[in-house]
Amino acid sequence: MKVASSSAAATAGPSCSLKAGRTAGEVVLGLSEQSVAISRCAGTRLPALLDEQQVNVLLYDMNGCYSRLKELVPTLPQNRKVSKVEILQHVIDYIRDLQLELNSESEVATAGGRGLPVRAPLSTLNGEISALAAEVRSESEYYIILLWETKATGGGCPPYFSGA
């Protein structure tokens, strides 16, 4: 990684959103000092704020993130090496595809009679579960009664099963 020398000190211009309206030592809320230092427009100050080991740790973390993205995004080609830019492009496309799919599912669900919603409402599921539980309960009660009657008749079939 090439880093500009600290002798070429350049100051951030007014287009730098992190530095605009802030004093040099002020920390931006929500970001660590290290993140702010990396994000500043004056990249020439980077070597003074981070030592080489810290830069290597950050690069290692980023490479791990790219590897994880390669695992998660199914549209990435697995048979060849892809650049970081290509990984990011596939990630953006994949997120956009997921958003479109989510929006189309919600449109189908709100359209009324045009199609069934992809997910059944919880009340419907609860009703189905209750019906199944009642069916299982009545079936198991039936077998318990059958077993009791079988024992009561001395091991033989109850009269209504004997065909008489």
From Swiss-Prot:
Chief subcellular location equals: cytoplasm
Q: Where in the cell is it found?
A: Cytoplasm; Nucleus
Keywords noted in UniProt? Biological rhythms, Cytoplasm, Developmental protein, Nucleus, Phosphoprotein, Repressor, Transcription, Transcription regulation
Give the function comment from the record: Transcriptional regulator (lacking a basic DNA binding domain) which negatively regulates the basic helix-loop-helix (bHLH) transcription factors by forming heterodimers and inhibiting their DNA binding and transcriptional activity. Implicated in regulating a variety of cellular processes, including cellular growth, senescence, differentiation, apoptosis, angiogenesis, and neoplastic transformation. Inhibits skeletal muscle and cardiac myocyte differentiation. Regulates the circadian clock by repressing the transcriptional activator activity of the CLOCK-BMAL1 heterodimer.
Quaternary data: Heterodimer with other HLH proteins. Interacts with COPS5, IFI204, GATA4, NKX2-5, CLOCK and BMAL1. Isoform Short can form homodimers.
Q: Which InterPro entries match?
A: bHLH_dom, DNA-bd_prot-inh, HLH_DNA-bd_sf
Gene Ontology terms for molecular function: identical protein binding; proteasome binding; protein dimerization activity; transcription corepressor activity; transcription regulator inhibitor activity
Gene3D superfamilies linked:
Helix-loop-helix DNA-binding domain
What kind of modification does the protein receive after translation? Phosphorylated in vitro by PKA and PKC.
| bHLH domain boundaries | 46-98
User: For the motif Nuclear export signal, what are the positions?
Assistant: 91-104
Which cellular component terms (GO) are annotated to the entry?
centrosome; cytoplasm; nucleus
What's the name of the protein? DNA-binding protein inhibitor ID-1
An example Gene Ontology biological process: regulation of angiogenesis
Give the top-rank taxon of the lineage listed in the UniProt record for this protein: Eukaryota
